[in-house]
Amino acid sequence: MRDMAQIRNIVVLSGAGISAESGLRTFRADDGLWEDHRVEDVATPEAFRRDPDLVQRFYDERRASIMAAQPNAAHRALARLDREWPAELLIVTQNIDDLHERAGAARVLHMHGEGLSAWCSACDARHHWTGTLRDEPPCPACGARALRPDIVWFGEMPYRMDEIFAALARADLFVSIGTSGAVYPAAGFVQQAKSCGARTLELNLERSQGSHGFDETRLGPASERVPEWVEDALGGRPC
């Protein structure tokens, strides 16, 4: 990979692997939630219409898990990069937790929604939410009992794609951390960035399905590989 001195704009994509080390289980990992619930039962609009109580209970549990988790060394390293990187940096996360923000990162975009947010299908308002949704509480904005988890379910369009593609077009470096490379559109970001001239780096516990598309892959736990890379990016100063 070329000298980081030539890199200005960076897009980081973070996936399940970065939060797994904080104890948050995912659909895609071997110990993931899919072992307990089929995706079709808890993560689709059809599932919510069919059994809203099950879906609300499922995300109430996810919300509690998020609040109990703590950022790890990878989150803290990216927060440091966010503070100290002098040019454009965008952290695009597939995760619904707030561990990037709690570690101190500000330039974060949640393409799949946020576990600590509720969306009202009646008035389109979004609210920070730490309690339960199972008992159908009223929307604080309009009073309708139409709140659901502010999550992008399978079959729905990810959030803020225009902003993501614009950032990828400007990127000099695209870094993917802890992703499976199996879920689109995020799995296509590496090719999108490369087509616009960016260099590409994968940091992952094991090679993803899209590893062949990266200029470089560094394998190992995110809590080790990410601080190492951030140290390199910031000129060798230890995290």
Regions found by a protein language model. Give the residues of each.
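Conserved catalytic core of sirtuin-type NAD+-dependent deacylases
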Residues: 1-239
